[in-house]
């Protein structure tokens, strides 16, 4: 089946109110006529309100609803209560966020988030009607040891074991080899395709229907120079973009490359 690609910008710990407004204005100008590709941005959570306001009333052919959708970089497993500093799925929903990144290697590393904890976040998002963007991927040492498939399977199975394979209906997986994140080193299109095909096949072993519809993005030093070649691969359904998403022209090139390659 034809899958609609998704290109999502992960701003990480970058930005300000002024930066958010300026970047979104640039993105609206660049992307107002893009079709055939879903687009989302995940600014820091305190700027979601600014972003929501900046995205509304763009005045183009979208009828006041921007082609760019909102996302977020994290979520807590709790809905409310005495959980200082945390953000719930319902709060994200209240700001119009749809695509929520979970399991990013930076969260797994710096905040010691386990596969099982990430699976709980996945479940919380599904229950709230939001779209989990599940990041998976291996370290450089694991890659060199030939453990890429083992690591990816383990991270996917944590969700399947907790929620069932059907939980991946309407969800997104982002394969991000840790050794490629922010390093300038990207997997080759063939390398990325091999892992994406494995991921889809691993899910297909449980459900072919779920595997055929799940969006599998590539992430890890995706930029305006390498995106088009990555998107020629049949199992790469878009990208989770870091640094290049902070510049409207570069991010627009990536989005347009996905739209052109998949339509």
Curated annotation (Swiss-Prot):
Residues the record marks as active site: 104, 176
Reaction equation(s) it catalyzes: D-glyceraldehyde 3-phosphate = dihydroxyacetone phosphate
The enzyme's E.C. designation: 5.3.1.1
Transmembrane portions of the chain: none
UniProt GO molecular function: triose-phosphate isomerase activity
Localization per Swiss-Prot or TrEMBL: Cytoplasm
GO biological process: gluconeogenesis; glyceraldehyde-3-phosphate biosynthetic process; glycerol catabolic process; glycolytic process
Keywords: Cytoplasm, Gluconeogenesis, Glycolysis, Isomerase
CDD domains, alphabetized: TIM
Keyword Metal-binding on entry: no
Pathway assignment: Carbohydrate biosynthesis; gluconeogenesis; Carbohydrate degradation; glycolysis; D-glyceraldehyde 3-phosphate from glycerone phosphate: step 1/1
Family per similarity comment: Belongs to the triosephosphate isomerase family.
Functional description taken from the UniProt entry: Involved in the gluconeogenesis. Catalyzes stereospecifically the conversion of dihydroxyacetone phosphate (DHAP) to D-glyceraldehyde-3-phosphate (G3P).
NCBIfam families, per the entry: tim
Quaternary state and interactors: Homodimer.
UniProt protein name: Triosephosphate isomerase
Source species of the chain: Haemophilus influenzae (strain PittGG)
Species classification: Bacteria, Pseudomonadati, Pseudomonadota, Gammaproteobacteria, Pasteurellales
Gene name tied to this protein: tpiA
């Amino acid at each position: 089946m034809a899958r609609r690609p998704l290109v999502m910008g992960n701003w990480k710990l970058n930005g300000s109110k002024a930066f958010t407004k300026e970047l979104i204005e640039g993105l609206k100008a660049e992307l107002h006529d893009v079709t055939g590709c879903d687009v989302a941005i995940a600014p820091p959570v305190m700027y979601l309100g600014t972003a929501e306001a900046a995205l509304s009333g763009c005045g183009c052919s979208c009828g006041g609803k921007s082609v760019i959708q909102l996302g977020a970089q994290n979520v807590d497993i709790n809905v409310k209560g005495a959980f200082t500093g945390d953000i719930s799925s319902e709060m994200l929903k209240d700001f119009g966020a749809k695509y929520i990144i979970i399991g990013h290697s930076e969260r797994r590393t710096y905040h010691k988030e386990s596969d099982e904890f990430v699976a709980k976040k996945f479940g919380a998002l599904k229950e709230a009607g939001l779209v989990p963007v599940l990041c998976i991927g291996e370290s450089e040492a694991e890659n060199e040891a030939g453990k890429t498939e083992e690591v990816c399977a383990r991270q996917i199975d944590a969700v399947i074991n907790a929620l069932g394979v059907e939980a991946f209906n309407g969800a997104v997986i982002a394969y991000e080899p840790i050794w490629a994140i922010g390093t300038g080193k990207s997997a080759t299109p063939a390398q990325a395709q091999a892992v994406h095909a494995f991921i889809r096949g691993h899910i297909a072993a449980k459900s072919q229907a779920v595997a055929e519809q799940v969006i599998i993005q590539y992430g890890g030093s995706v930029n305006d120079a390498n995106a088009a070649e990555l998107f020629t691969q049949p199992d790469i359904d878009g990208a989770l973009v870091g640094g290049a998403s902070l510049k409207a022209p570069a991010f627009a090139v990536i989005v347009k490359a996905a739209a052109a390659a998949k339509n």
